[in-house]
């Protein structure tokens, strides 16, 4: 979930930061997606782009697939990319061009995937992979430097976009030999190496990848040796590289090739023996056990590992603190004191009271909901969250926390949300605490049934996420209001949002739609909630469509009003940059120690005397990949920074000061690859007089190449004969069933949900994981009702693939033996 802090503006502070400060902004190259449309020489325009334009490339409208992102356009760009690689000598300007080309190409693949279009041709994707391979074998490919690393990261990450890892894996494996104690200091560079493991994870179920590995099983030996040789890295910020090497080796257990599986099983056994639970690096044990549990559970039985007991022991050790609130929350934490837990209870209690008033619930839960208590699980930091949460609770961890509703109709169900702290000081610092708690309350008092029931007919994501954002921010969500200036969405479009859309549309535009409806049409909200509280989600969707059409014009005008009233709007008389503001133009007595917001990816020019101090802060949202602050100029200025507290030259957390005014502070990502979200304060202080010192902030927020918030769990589900299994399929799911001796036939039924809104096809094979292209048995009728009869002659697994080319569905799957 996105995390922003409310920004308070002071007119004087914004009029003039301190005496002696001059401000200038640097215009960016015309590289937004709309700027590229009329370009006569598209590659040349891309080459000079700035990183600030990347998001617009990834969020480009679908129409760009017919021009900027057409196959012909990308084919031409591939030849340009090849030529740029051929003349690459490691210079920063060249590297910047390579990164720009890489990001544009990746954006094209991302937009095409999300639009549901047919993929680009395999020939084009293979040519891109060959270009990447040429780059990775280039003598300057792994040079260290900000621009050079940017090029390496972008091009190596493209492997997963084009899904051609067999053509580049040799070079990517070879690159691991460059990892050492010196190169490990640059975690961005290390993250570029980690793109091998991102690609391996992204190639699950890819038959070409498994055939390649079957012919190159020496790579499994190389990965295990890499992990053993670099155990020292487990004590550093680069530990994720070793961890992922072993984890992705374990995922190869899914391969249909017997030797590949045998080698992967051997490595997992070795890892379990070397890093037992309770030892210093037991997260490697967890990774191995998790992979075996999904793909080779018989090995766990052979080793005598009791998963339930292991989870209980681990939870007791990692989450030793338990505190019951007066309300429904039970707080289990890694490091919260009782006083802090009580403070969290107070926050949740106030949020619950506010919730019931806003949603007008009458304190009555929906029918058949037994989630009377909710566990609030709080890990000490993101690292612990990533290491342990998935094993203990089964959630994904590439996020800022997650609500796990379970089945509310089950009286033995335990609802919980898992979260982590972004700072370990006296403050609570629990990321998304109020947002996730609102999900619990909304599900219990406003939404009948389970999460999949809520989503069955669509047109509800705007409420689920927008309402949680509204309850957290109320009228103070400036990041959402600022988004309006980038182009308005119609209310109908916002209402149609799905979890496959980008985070801005899901959270910020969802917030705007919810706020509009609550402020302008509360009676309509009451009517909608009456439907959702009784499980009438089909009627909800139909009503929402009509409301969108009815209020589109009014919503657009309301957005204009919000924008005019926004303090950051230059037309607002309260904005200090507005010449009509009475506090501007020439404020003779500026506030000397004002702490002023500094926008990400902006520049200031500073001038000051010795011992003068300029104070700023930068808000870093969740899902930020890169963040650094730099000064350069004449004289002697120093840069000091702190996280979550004002920085001064005499009180700071980090500095890289040296003689002169050329300094840079770079913040390293946490284990999940993201910068810790929150407010970063900085001080520019004169050791001597200085002038023309440029202060620059560089922030790369979540690139939309990441998987959508809601995505398929690609871990195979183990089916038992006679037991029905409910599965939600967005694009692809895997299921396996073990057939014992004496069985001659397996009969399998796939039954759609009552709504039967999608089309899920069923594929089966005995010796490998089937795909739509390669299978032994298939049922591909219209809708999601499928049936297979599979003859068997020996014991072993039968593998199934549930595949939806366009719209997925929730299905019930059951199998019987004859």
Curated annotation (Swiss-Prot):
Alphabetic keyword roster: Collagen degradation, Hydrolase, Metal-binding, Metalloprotease, Protease, Secreted, Signal, Zinc, Zymogen
EC number: 3.4.24.3
Cofactor: how bound: Binds 1 zinc ion.
Residues annotated as binding Zn(2+): 435, 439
The organism of origin for this protein: Vibrio cholerae serotype O1 (strain ATCC 39315 / El Tor Inaba N16961)
Name of this protein: Microbial collagenase
Family indicated by similarity: Belongs to the peptidase M9A family.
Subcellular location: Secreted
MF GO annotations: metalloendopeptidase activity; zinc ion binding
